[in-house]
């Protein structure tokens, strides 16, 4: 499994790229492989991770599960609403788990929104060679025309509370933040833009 390096054109043109574009045919050639999946809320990170688990038999770690375990156990006073603070708190833990998996030649999918834009600076080349990265993001047009459908799928893989404050404006701003943030960090070619057929966009 590998990721195609030439998807930046599609990102700049705001056209959707399906996830299979990122995947090479022979994933078995890799002894160890870490796949990082991030993106705005409701973009389908957990759905994609679950599908990769089923297809490639890679275990996956939900950063949301780690977050809630730490919050519920009283190990932090942060709340689920403290996004930036949670990224600062959770990422050092997650990155060391990733390093441990690479060192032990273990495959792992990590999914969640708490991956910083500059995540690469925390890994030496020996680790980066084994890490692949995807960010899922929706265009404003897609959100406006599919908002009810997006909300209806928010518990497709795992049960979660309906976000009463989730609005078109908020979702649009969140997705734009991810697109702009990862572009500025040099990750533009790794952003999967969802602006048409959702199933085609996240197909693996």
Label every model-predicted segment.
Residues 130-177:
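A glycine- and Lys/Arg-enriched "phosphate-lid" helix/loop adjacent to the NTP-binding pocket
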Residues 86-128:
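Glycine-rich phosphate-binding loop used to anchor ATP phosphates in small-molecule kinases
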Residues 41:
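The conserved Walker
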Residues 176-204:
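NTP-dependent small-molecule kinase module
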Residues 50-93:
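Conserved substrate/cofactor phosphate-moiety recognition/catalytic segment
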Residues 37:
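Hydrophobic anchor at the beta1->P-loop junction of P-loop NTPases
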Residues 44:
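Conserved glycine(s) of the Walker
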């Amino acid at each position: 499994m590998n990721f195609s390096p030439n998807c930046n054109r599609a990102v700049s043109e705001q056209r959707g790229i399906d996830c299979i574009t990122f995947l090479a045919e022979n994933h078995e050639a890799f002894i160890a492989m870490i796949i990082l999946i991030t993106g705005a809320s409701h973009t389908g990170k957990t759905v994609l991770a679950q599908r990769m688990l089923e297809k490639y038999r890679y275990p996956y770690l939900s950063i949301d599960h780690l977050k809630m375990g730490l919050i519920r156990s009283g190990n932090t006073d942060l709340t689920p609403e403290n996004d930036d603070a949670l990224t600062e708190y959770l990422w050092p833990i997650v990155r060391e788990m990733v390093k441990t998996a690479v060192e032990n030649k273990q495959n792992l999918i990590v999914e969640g929104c708490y991956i910083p834009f500059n995540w690469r600076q925390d890994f030496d080349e020996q680790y980066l060679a084994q890490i692949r990265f995807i960010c899922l993001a929706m265009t404003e047009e897609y959100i406006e025309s599919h908002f009810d459908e997006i909300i209806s799928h928010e518990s497709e893989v795992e049960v979660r509370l309906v976000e009463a404050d989730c609005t078109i404006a908020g979702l649009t701003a969140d997705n734009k933040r991810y697109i702009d943030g990862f572009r500025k960090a040099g990750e533009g070619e790794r952003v999967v833009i969802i602006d048409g057929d959702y199933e085609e966009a996240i197909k693996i």
